[in-house]
Amino acid sequence: MIPGNRMLMVVLLCQVLLGGATDASLIPETGKKKVAEIQGHAGGRRSGQSHELLRDFEATLLQMFGLRRRPQPSKSAVIPDYMRDLYRLQSGEEEEEEQSQGTGLEYPERPASRANTVRSFHHEEHLENIPGTSESSAFRFFFNLSSIPENEVISSAELRLFREQVDQGPDWEQGFHRINIYEVMKPPAEMVPGHLITRLLDTRLVRHNVTRWETFDVSPAVLRWTREKQPNYGLAIEVTHLHQTRTHQGQHVRISRSLPQGSGNWAQLRPLLVTFGHDGRGHTLTRRRAKRSPKHHPQRSRKKNKNCRRHSLYVDFSDVGWNDWIVAPPGYQAFYCHGDCPFPLADHLNSTNHAIVQTLVNSVNSSIPKACCVPTELSAISMLYLDEYDKVVLKNYQEMVVEGCGCR
């Protein structure tokens, strides 16, 4: 479980140490004067100490995020559209945007129900042709999954392949082809030349006249590679056409870039392996309903309520220089709890019996402190980011948003 209060404290401290960012939304207005005073008194000692503390704070945050070091994404890193769509569905944004986006993506309820982490992997662009029959073509390709952490238990995996419609021949509208996905069980050096030792993972009969993504279950292979630590010799794809010559086979199932195709377009059409796993911390992914962003109104001149309640605190990842590897969200409303817990405690202050007793004793004995205004309900956020290996990760982090406050 990710400690949300610790996360907020560390982000605030990082913000203090970043010098020129004191006007950012991470620090409430009431705290900015104190920050300025701290900066003024620190003098020459501040520079060396702040850099050292900042490294410690950043290391703590990265550990909370399950990262060993700060990601330094390359300019060539690509965020698959599928992962962006999953994030929008997971965070509740897609329901508001689906009419304009028109993605038609179906949320993977079953795989997500056992996972709090989704990872995506592009295949290595070295393909090995496999001898086939006159009616089929086959290729072997490889996904490097070595960046999956040891403590993450994979529950399922899927292979996504993009295929384009075939418009050749008089019967193309009624035509079908079959796509078979295999796990390669033996390396080439141990095989009889020209033959693969494989096992079938998934198969599908599809129409020629449809352009779309196809999803195949490759969980048995990925579980062997990750849980059982068996060697990863890659996957094989076989495309069989019932009424086409071999020269037309496989051209519409996109597993390699065509010469006239731009790198940007190909980056979004490459085969994609997606894993669903759980690191043992927090709850699984659950699709959220869309939430309307709260509207901020200017403070009225009337006397403010000083009792315990929730206050706005927006965490902007650009304020701590993390917007280069955190894809979404750019920030989030974390909130914080602040205010008095006066005697007698009102019902709306969401107090415990112990807090009521403590407040009662405080009313006659001031040496006993009042009950404290603290979060009573916390919720998770979803984050889409690039890890230290340039792999795209969608992850749930628990206890990041204050939903309710009370006197405890």
From Swiss-Prot:
Question: Entry's PROSITE patterns?
Answer: TGF_BETA_1 (PS00250), TGF_BETA_2 (PS51362)
- The answer to whether keyword Transmembrane helix applies is no
Residue(s) carrying Phosphoserine: S91
Q: Which GO terms describe its cellular component?
A: extracellular region; extracellular space; vesicle
| CDD domains membership | TGF_beta_BMP4_BMP2B (cd19391)
Sorted alphabetically, which keywords does the UniProt record give?
Chondrogenesis, Cleavage on pair of basic residues, Cytokine, Developmental protein, Differentiation, Disulfide bond, Extracellular matrix, Glycoprotein, Growth factor, Osteogenesis, Phosphoprotein, Secreted, Signal
Quote the SMART domains the UniProt record gives: TGFB (SM00204)
SUPFAM superfamilies reported for this sequence? Cystine-knot cytokines
The record's comment on protein family reads:
Belongs to the TGF-beta family.
State the protein's name. Answer: Bone morphogenetic protein 4
The species this protein belongs to is: Rattus norvegicus
Gene symbol of the encoding locus: Bmp4
